[in-house]
Regions:
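Short, acidic/charged, Gly/Pro-enriched secondary-structure junctions
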Residues: 153-184
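Oligomerization/assembly interface segments of phage tail-like spikes and tubes
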Residues: 130-149, 198-212
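Small/polar beta-strand repeat architecture
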Residues: 2-8, 15-47, 52-124
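Short structured motifs
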Residues: 126-130, 189-191
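Short beta-strand and beta-hairpin "edge-sheet" elements
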Residues: 172-215
Length: 215
């Protein structure tokens, strides 16, 4: 079988820095996933949108929620919310996208290295240690880059580290199925290093909070 390996060259890391213009929702197809219609919305899989002003008895399942776009077409997109059997209509609904800024000069990335906790269920009748897996810890995400204090993405990283606020991030691989990872994280540290006849380097450590969505 030929290799299906993905080249890392061309990968992009982005950080949320605001919001874009709201797009009008003209249709809602309940189910799992939920499919929404919005003419020429311009979203990409992995984008993040916040819903408002949808109507129907179960509109609260979407209104006010910030969700990851998946399975997009020119005029529709889906979100991973199970609305099977629910009543949600377009009304004057909108989807407002989160605006992301690319972090430039990245040399390498690593992470998504978490693991589930172990729950010890051994008792006096056990003949060997017994365990269940608990909640999954999504781990960390680290980027190594050449420092540029004028780069808007690097500025946003530093600002997030100072504020301690949670931020949305995207890792966009250059190819492959579901190439975009979207996640929330806290920038724990942004460090700099240098030496004789060297480029000034920077490293950012991001603690992931919650699930990672590939789309």
């Amino acid at each position: 079988m030929p290799s299906t390996a993905i080249s890392a060259q061309g990968s992009i890391v982005q950080i949320a820095t605001g919001s874009g213009g709201a797009k009008t929702i003209t249709g809602v197809a309940v189910g799992n996933p939920t499919i929404l219609t919005s003419a020429a919305h311009g979203f990409s899989s992995g984008d993040v949108v916040t819903f408002a002003a949808l109507t129907g008895a179960d509109a609260a399942l979407l209104n006010g929620q910030t969700l990851v776009v998946r399975d997009k077409t020119t005029n529709t997109f889906a979100v991973s919310v199970d609305t099977t059997g629910k009543t949600i209509t377009a009304g004057s609904g909108t989807a407002t996208p989160v605006a992301f800024t690319q972090i430039n000069n990245i040399k390498s990335f690593s992470g998504f290295d978490g693991q589930a906790s172990e729950l010890d269920k051994t008792n006096m009748s056990s003949t060997a240690k017994e365990f269940l897996l608990g909640l999954t810890d999504p781990g960390n995400f680290q980027i190594d880059l050449d420092q540029d204090n004028s780069d808007a993405g690097q500025q946003a990283l530093v600002a997030a580290q100072i504020s301690g606020a949670a931020k949305l991030f995207k890792l966009v691989l250059p190819s492959g199925a579901t190439p975009t990872a979207t996640f929330t994280g806290y920038v724990k540290s942004v460090s700099s290093s240098g030496g004789v006849d060297q480029i000034v380097k920077r490293a950012a450590q991001i603690r992931i909070s919650g699930a990672i969505a590939w789309s």
